[in-house]
Swiss-Prot record:
Keywords: Cell cycle, Cell division, Cytoplasm, Septation. This is Cell division protein ZapD. Interacts with FtsZ. It is found in: Cytoplasm. Its main location: cytoplasm. Coiled coil: none annotated. Cell division factor that enhances FtsZ-ring assembly. Directly interacts with FtsZ and promotes bundling of FtsZ protofilaments, with a reduction in FtsZ GTPase activity. The lineage of its organism: Bacteria, Pseudomonadati, Pseudomonadota, Gammaproteobacteria, Enterobacterales. GO terms for cellular component: cell division site; cytoplasm. One of its GO terms (biological process) is FtsZ-dependent cytokinesis. It holds the Pfam family ZapD.
């Protein structure tokens, strides 16, 4: 049984958007293949939320900036003794390739946005019970198509996100690996520190404590308050050890 729970908290708007996109893309593949109405609604709801997130900001622009920033950071390690130079060079080339693919890709989400079935389902998702067969006969007949035909269409939809997915995965992996976990101690359920221009907080907490963190702040300063899962009987120890990485 897992004894540590990892919590992640964004310290700026771009990281908040990236984590939401990562979560939604992961959710797209959870219930594949789509074999019934429930699985279809799970998939289309996540597609719809993804498109909503895409429409709120300059996702491509921010990712390109970060890909270039990560290249500059890696270039400072070239020639440093004791550093795996082949690994550094490989990462730089991967980042350059991701930039090239992302620049040449169509507008993020445009392929999904223009799909007729996705558009029809999106219109009904906000209506309680609005995806019944009499509301969406198009979805009803789609669910009765051969499984291979549905699978092929779903794969095409997901593949249209590959330029974004690959760039985002690389960026988030590098950010998450940019800082080690260090042991910290909260006093009376409270901890605060300087963020040091971090984008992301990562916090490991023992499951035995049955506590969760409420985090507030921004890249220069943040505060963590630990709360009991059982609000009536749970207790927060005077001193609580946890692991924290400011990435």
């Amino acid at each position: 049984m897992q004894t540590q729970v990892l919590f992640e908290h964004p310290l700026n708007e771009k990281m908040r958007t990236w984590l939401r996109i990562e979560f939604l893309i992961q959710q797209l593949t959870v219930n594949l293949p789509i074999v019934d109405h429930a699985g279809a609604l799970h998939f289309f709801r996540n597609v719809s939320e993804l498109l909503d997130v895409f429409e709120r900001g300059e996702v491509r622009t921010e990712l390109l900036k970060e890909l270039n920033r990560q290249q500059r950071k890696l270039q400072t390690w070239i020639g440093v003794p004791g550093v795996d130079q082949s690994r550094i060079e490989a990462l730089i080339q991967q980042l350059k390739a991701a930039v090239s693919v992302l620049i040449s890709a169509p507008r993020i989400g445009q392929f999904l946005r223009e799909d007729r079935l996705i558009a029809l389902v999106r219109q009904r998702l906000s209506i309680p019970g609005g995806c019944c067969s009499f509301d969406l006969p198009t979805l009803h007949i789609w669910l009765h198509l051969p499984q291979a035909q549905r699978d092929s269409q779903v794969e095409t939809w997901i593949a249209s996100l590959n330029p974004l997915t690959q760039a985002l995965t690389m960026v988030l992996d590098l950010i998450r690996q940019s800082a080690p976990f260090r042991k910290q101690t909260s006093l009376n359920g409270f901890y605060q520190d300087n963020g040091g221009d971090a984008d992301l907080l990562r916090l490991n907490l023992s499951l035995d404590s049955q506590l969760y963190p409420q985090i507030s702040g921004h890249k220069s300063r943040f505060a963590i308050r630990f709360m009991p899962l059982d609000t009536e009987n749970g207790q927060v120890p005077e001193r609580l050890d946890f692991e924290l990485a400011c990435c």
